[in-house]
C-alpha cells in the first residue's frame, strides 16, 4: 500500500522539498485539492525516536508534578512573597537567597543530568506542558525537584545560614556605609518609620477645642479633656460683658438751642484710640485703668423706639440687661465631660450588658449641670430692673409740674387732659412730651445754618444735630465701629454675641 501511494503521488507531479527541512515536502497541487500531501519520509524515519522522547518527557512531567506538590509550592510562594515585598531590606534578603539557591542548584544540575532523555527534554522543554513549572533561574528541573533527603537537608542549612547572616546589623555588609552606597543606610530607618506595623504614637497634646467631632479613643478616655490648660490672660474674653442702661445727657438735653457741646456722662465705656469724639475725662480715665482679666467689660446698650412718647433714656431702660462673669470654655469643658461619660455609660461591657446604675449616675450629673445653668439664668434675669433714681435724674424739669420736692417720695399720677385720651404718667416731663403729640408743638429748632428742622423733644434734636457734625459717641468695644445713636449700637452688639 505504501508503494502504490508513492507511485500515485509521483505520477501527478514531483514533490517540492523545502530547504532546511529535508523531512518535509509539499505537493504544489495541494491548494487546488484543498488538502496537503506530505512525503512519507516525514513519518517513517523518526517515528520511533520521537515517540520514545515524548513518553520519557511525559513520565518526567508526572514525577516533577508530584514532587512539586510535596515541596515546591511552599518554597516558591515564600520566594515570591519576599520578592514582592515593599521593603527594600526584604527585597535585598530575597535576592541574596535566590542567588545562593541558583549557585547551589547549578552545581547539582551538572552532575544529575547526564542521560540522553534529559538532554532531549531540555531541548523541548519550552514547547511542553511542563512550562508552568519551569523556572528560568535553574538549569534543570530534575535537579530542582529531586526528592532526596540530602537536598532537603542542604536547603534547610542554606536557610539557617542566611537567617543567621542577616540578623546582623546592616552596616556589616561590605561598602554599605561608603559614600556611594550611603542611601542604603536609610533603609532600616525607613522601614521603621513607614512600616504598617510600626508602634502607634499616642497624641498627648490633643486639641480638644476643635470645632469638629471627637475621635472614639477620645470619648472612651476617662479624662478626655486635660485639667491643666494654659490660657492666655492677655486675651480679652468676648462673653463676660456687662450691659447696663445709660445715663446719657445727649438724649435728654434740656437746652432748646440744640448745642452739640454736651458731654456724655455714661458709665464705663472702652474708648477706641483710633476715633476722636467728645468724652468726659473721667470716662477716659476709667477706660485706661480697665483690666479685662479682673472684671467683666461694661458696655452701654439702649434700645430706643422711634415711635415712643417718652424720652429715649426712659423708654429704653427696660431693655437694659446684665451678663454674668461666665467662662464659656469652662462650660464647654463640662459639657464635653458629660458627653463622654454618657457615651461610656450606654456602651455594653465585654458580656454585652449595660450597667443601669452608671446610666443613672450620668443622668443625675446632667440634671445637676442643668440646674446650675438655670441658676445662672435666674441670676441674670434678676438684674433686669429699672433704676428709678437714674430715671428721675435724667428727666427734664417741668415748669408746670405739680410735683413738690419737699413731699415724701410718693409718686403722683399725671393724667393727660386731652379729650378721649386717658393716659397717665408718673412724671410730668413724660406727660409734657406726650401732650405735644396732641398739640403738634415743636419747640426745639435746629441751629445749623440752612436747616429748618424742628422737634418736640430735645433728644430728637440732639440726634438730628449729630448728622450735621458727624459725631458718633457710641463706640463698639469689640471692633472699631461707632454710631450716632445708642439703639444702633445695641443692634450692632448683638452680632458679636
UniProtKB/Swiss-Prot annotation:
Keywords: Cytoplasm, DNA-binding, Metal-binding, Nucleus, Repeat, Transcription, Transcription regulation, Ubl conjugation, Zinc, Zinc-finger. Expressed in intestine, hypodermis and a few neurons. GO terms for cellular component: chromatin; cytoplasm; nucleus. It comes from the Eukaryota. One of its GO terms (biological process) is apoptotic cell clearance. Transcription factor which modulates genes involved in lipid metabolism and the phase I detoxification pathway, including cytochrome P450 oxidases. Required for diet restriction- and mitochondrial dysfunction-mediated lifespan extension, perhaps acting in a ubiquitination-dependent manner. Involved in the response to oxidative stress. Plays a role in cell death. Belongs to the krueppel C2H2-type zinc-finger protein family. This is Kruppel-like factor 1. It comes from Caenorhabditis elegans.
Amino acid at each position: 500500500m505504501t508503494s502504490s501511494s508513492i507511485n500515485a503521488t509521483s505520477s501527478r507531479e514531483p514533490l517540492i522539498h523545502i530547504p532546511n527541512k529535508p523531512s518535509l515536502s509539499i505537493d504544489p497541487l495541494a491548494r487546488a485539492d484543498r488538502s496537503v500531501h506530505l512525503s512519507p519520509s516525514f513519518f517513517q524515519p523518526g517515528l520511533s525516536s520521537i515517540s520514545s522522547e515524548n513518553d520519557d518527557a511525559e513520565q518526567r512531567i508526572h514525577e516533577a508534578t508530584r514532587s512539586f506538590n510535596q515541596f515546591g509550592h511552599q518554597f516558591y510562594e515564600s520566594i515570591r512573597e519576599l520578592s514582592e515585598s515593599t521593603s527594600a531590606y526584604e527585597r535585598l534578603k530575597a535576592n541574596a537567597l535566590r542567588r545562593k539557591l541558583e549557585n547551589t542548584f547549578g552545581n547539582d544540575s551538572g552532575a544529575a543530568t547526564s542521560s540522553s532523555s534529559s538532554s532531549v527534554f531540555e531541548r523541548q522543554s519550552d514547547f511542553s506542558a511542563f512550562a508552568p513549572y519551569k523556572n528560568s533561574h535553574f538549569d534543570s528541573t530534575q535537579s530542582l525537584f529531586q526528592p532526596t533527603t540530602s537536598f532537603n537537608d542542604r536547603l534547610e542549612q542554606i536557610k539557617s545560614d542566611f537567617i543567621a547572616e542577616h540578623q546582623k546589623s546592616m552596616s556589616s555588609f561590605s561598602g554599605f556605609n561608603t559614600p556611594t552606597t550611603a542611601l542604603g543606610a536609610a533603609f532600616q530607618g525607613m522601614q521603621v518609620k513607614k512600616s504598617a506595623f510600626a508602634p502607634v504614637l499616642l497624641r498627648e497634646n490633643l486639641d480638644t477645642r476643635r470645632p469638629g467631632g471627637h475621635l472614639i479613643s477620645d470619648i472612651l478616655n476617662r479624662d478626655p479633656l486635660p485639667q491643666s490648660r494654659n490660657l492666655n490672660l492677655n486675651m480679652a474674653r468676648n462673653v463676660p460683658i456687662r450691659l447696663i442702661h445709660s445715663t446719657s445727657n445727649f438724649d435728654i438735653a434740656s437746652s432748646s438751642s440744640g448745642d452739640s457741646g454736651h458731654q456724655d456722662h455714661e458709665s464705663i465705656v472702652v474708648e477706641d484710640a483710633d476715633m476722636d469724639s467728645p468724652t468726659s475725662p473721667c470716662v477716659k480715665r476709667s477706660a485706661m485703668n480697665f483690666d479685662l482679666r479682673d472684671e467683666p467689660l461694661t458696655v452701654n446698650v439702649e434700645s430706643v423706639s422711634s415711635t415712643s412718647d417718652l424720652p429715649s433714656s426712659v423708654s429704653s431702660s427696660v431693655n437694659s440687661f446684665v451678663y454674668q462673669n461666665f467662662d464659656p470654655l469652662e462650660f464647654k469643658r463640662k459639657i464635653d465631660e458629660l458627653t463622654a461619660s454618657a457615651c461610656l455609660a450606654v456602651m455594653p461591657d465585654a458580656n454585652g450588658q449595660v450597667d443601669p446604675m452608671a446610666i443613672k449616675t450620668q443622668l443625675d450629673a446632667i440634671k445637676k449641670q442643668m440646674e446650675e445653668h438655670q441658676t445662672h439664668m435666674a441670676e441674670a434675669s434678676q438684674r433686669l430692673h429699672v433704676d428709678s433714681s437714674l430715671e428721675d435724674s435724667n428727666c427734664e424739669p417741668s415748669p408746670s409740674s405739680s410735683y413738690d420736692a419737699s413731699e415724701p417720695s410718693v409718686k403722683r399720677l399725671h393724667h393727660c387732659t386731652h379729650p378721649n385720651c386717658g393716659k397717665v404718667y408718673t412724671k410730668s416731663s413724660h406727660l409734657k412730651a406726650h401732650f405735644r403729640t396732641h398739640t403738634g408743638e415743636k419747640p426745639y429748632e435746629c441751629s445749623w445754618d440752612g436747616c429748618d428742622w424742628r422737634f418736640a423733644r430735645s433728644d430728637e434734636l440732639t440726634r438730628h444735630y449729630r448728622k450735621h457734625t458727624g459725631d458718633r459717641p457710641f463706640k463698639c468695644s469689640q471692633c472699631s465701629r461707632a454710631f450716632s445713636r445708642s439703639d444702633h449700637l445695641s443692634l450692632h452688639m448683638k452680632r458679636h454675641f
